[in-house]
Amino acid sequence: MNKLAILAIIAMVLFSANAFRFQSRLRSNVEAKTGDACEQAAIQCVESACESLCTEGEDRTGCYMYIYSNCPPYV
């Protein structure tokens, strides 16, 4: 292979690696901004949303625990 072909292959590999890293970072930023509805309800201290948005069991219990430990008038 000539030098130009080798350089082109190296450039393609580096470009695809950077594109993959950018896509992963973008995906994690979007997930961090949206979060799940149960978590958002807890952060916003909406007890009724814990009942309507969270599934039975651990999710709902965690939502209530967050509210009771961090949100007025419980604090």
Swiss-Prot record:
Q: Provide the function of this protein.
A: Mating ciliate pheromones (or gamones) are diffusible extracellular communication signals that distinguish different intraspecific classes of cells commonly referred to as 'mating types'. They prepare the latter for conjugation by changing their cell surface properties. The membrane-bound form promotes inter-cellular communication and adhesion for mating pair formation and may act as binding site for the secreted form.
Disulfide bonds listed in the record: C38-C54, C45-C71, C50-C63
Per its UniProt record, what CDD domains does this chain match? MER1_2_10 (cd23510)
Q: Which residues form the propeptide?
A: 20-35
Q: What is this protein called?
A: Mating pheromone Er-1/Er-3
Q: Which gene encodes it?
A: MAT1
Signal peptide region? 1-19
List cellular component terms (GO). Answer: extracellular region; plasma membrane
- Subunit and partners: Homodimer.
Q: Which UniProt keywords apply?
A: Cell membrane, Disulfide bond, Membrane, Pheromone, Secreted, Signal
Q: Name one GO molecular function term.
A: pheromone activity
| Highest taxon of source | Eukaryota
